[in-house]
Structures are given as structure tokens and as C-alpha cells.
Regions:
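Long, compositionally biased intrinsically disordered terminal regions
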Residues: 171, 182-183, 187, 197, ...
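Short coil/turn segments at secondary-structure boundaries
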Residues: 71-76, 177-178, 233-240
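Charged, alpha-helical interface segments at or near domain boundaries
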Residues: 31-132
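Short, charged/polar micro-motifs that form catalytic or ligand-binding hotspots
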Residues: 3-11, 43, 47, 107-110, ...
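Internal, well-folded beta-alpha domain core
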Residues: 103-196
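Short, hydrophobic/amphipathic alpha-helical patches that form generic packing surfaces
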Residues: 12-23, 90-94, 161-165, 219-226
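Acidic, Ser/Thr-rich peripheral helices and adjacent loops at domain boundaries
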Residues: 48-53, 190-202
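N-terminal ordered "arm"
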Residues: 1-53
């Protein structure tokens, strides 16, 4: 068994997958992992992320499987679960070996690895769609729009694409509290990401300073939500099924 150890990122995993083909590995005897995985008599290979190799893999995936299946693979890699790297590697290998056409990579759902990839992508995709509606932006004193989230899956980049399209002329900041990951969108310019606890400590105090208009409108919004509620029809259990408590923590109407 040959084990490729890579960092937990799209670039790291795609570089590892590129290396498996470059080294002419036997697929069934090869493992790609983001965690410390040592098996008896196995050969361990440390993978350094390579942007050029990553771009080549992305280009191949889009050409062979299409944009939709490529997005599915990326959503699967956004999962926090450690089995994602091997699942995506074996799914890609199966698709290439069987000359799978665009839009049909996930058809072989009975295959263990394809099924894993599909399940991981579905979970990440569901959370992404939830946060498109549940993320709440608030205006800071410096007029920047700010939203704090804590998703299980690493989907901030997907959300940045969505909100950059919705608010192209707004300065906004999207913060993943669980990963200390920032999505920064300057008005009228491309967005980018920053990561680190130090960055959060530098801006934390600024995110607590809301504009006068924001304070006024959030109070109006809370009042509206409480006014339209019908006490006799309250059903907390059903509400939690439709809107998980972990989303409510950062929604102004529940604060």
C-alpha cells in the first residue's frame, strides 16, 4: 500500500491525486489521506501542494466530467470528514478508467467510494443552500457589511461566490468562526480569503461596532418577527427541524 499524505485543502488533495498518476500507482493499492495514516508494510509519501498540478487536475476534471460533477467533487472535499480524500480519489479514478461522460460521474452510486463522495457533497451542499438564506449581514460603523457563520463544512468559498454575485458593489466581510477564515469582498473588485486567529483578534473589536441605522433596523426586524408570531401555534421542535439551533445562534431575530 502506498499512502499519500497531503494537507486538508483542495490544492493539497488535487496535488496528491496528480502525483498518484504521475507515479503510475496501482489504484487499489493507493491511498490519499489528510490525516496520519500508517499501515503495516505501507510506503508513506508526503505531498507538497503545487498550484500548477492543481490547475492541471481541475482542467482535466472539468473537461472529462463537466462543471456540475466538478462542483460535486469540490463540495465533497469541503467536508470535515477524513475519508473524503480517498473517496474523491477513487471516484475520479473510476470515472477516468470507465471514460465517464459529463454529468454522469455519480451514476455508479452502488460503488462504495462514489456513494461516499455523493453523500459528503450532498451534506455540504445542503448546508451551503441553508446558509444562503440564513446568513445575516449587519452594517458596521465603517459601512462594511459583516456576517458571522460557523458551518460544519468548509463552504465559505461557495458562499463568497454567491454573495459576490448578489452584492457586487458592496464592501462585505464573511467570517467562518470555526476556522478563523475570512472572505473579503471589496466593492467592485474580486474577493479573496484570509485565515488566522491573529487576523480575527485584530478586527474583532471593529465587528462589534454597529452603525446607528443597523441598530435601528435590527430592533425593527426583531419587533416584526415577534409581532407576527402566533403564540398558540408555536412549535419549537418543528422549528428546530426546519432551522437548526446552530444557525439560529448568528441570526439577529433569535438574539
Amino acid at each position: 500500500m502506498k499512502i499519500y499524505h497531503c494537507e486538508d485543502s483542495l490544492e493539497g488533495i488535487f496535488t496528491a491525486i496528480y502525483n498518484t498518476y504521475e507515479d503510475h500507482c496501482i489504484i487499489r493499492d493507493t491511498m490519499v489521506t489528510t490525516i496520519e495514516e500508517n499501515l503495516l508494510f505501507s510506503e508513506s509519501v508526503e505531498v507538497i501542494p503545487d498550484p500548477e498540478k492543481t490547475i492541471k487536475v481541475i482542467r482535466t476534471l472539468k473537461r472529462r466530467f463537466g462543471e456540475a460533477d466538478y462542483e460535486t467533487l469540490c463540495l465533497a472535499l469541503a467536508s470535515p470528514k477524513p475519508e473524503k480524500a480517498q473517496a474523491v480519489y477513487r471516484t475520479i479514478a473510476k470515472g477516468l478508467a470507465e471514460k465517464c461522460t459529463a454529468g454522469h460521474l455519480m451514476d455508479a452510486i452502488a460503488d462504495t467510494y462514489v456513494n461516499q463522495t455523493f453523500s459528503l457533497a450532498r451534506a455540504a451542499g445542503n448546508e451551503y443552500h441553508h446558509l444562503k438564506g440564513f446568513a445575516r449581514f449587519e452594517e458596521l460603523e465603517n459601512t462594511i457589511l459583516y456576517s458571522k457563520i460557523a458551518p460544519k463544512n468548509n463552504i465559505l468559498t461557495f458562499l463568497m461566490v454567491h454573495f459576490a454575485d448578489r452584492f457586487p458593489m458592496e464592501d462585505f466581510l464573511l467570517f467562518d468562526a470555526g476556522r478563523y477564515l475570512f472572505g473579503v469582498h471589496p466593492a467592485g473588485r474580486p474577493w479573496y480569503t484570509l485565515q488566522g486567529k491573529d487576523a480575527w483578534e485584530r478586527v474583532q473589536s471593529e465587528t462589534e461596532k454597529l452603525s446607528t441605522a443597523e441598530l435601528h433596523y435590527r430592533e425593527l426586524f426583531r419587533s416584526f418577527c415577534h409581532t407576527i408570531a402566533i403564540k398558540e401555534r408555536e412549535n419549537r421542535e418543528l422549528q428546530r427541524n426546519m432551522l437548526s439551533l446552530r444557525f439560529q445562534e448568528y441570526m439577529v431575530e433569535f438574539q
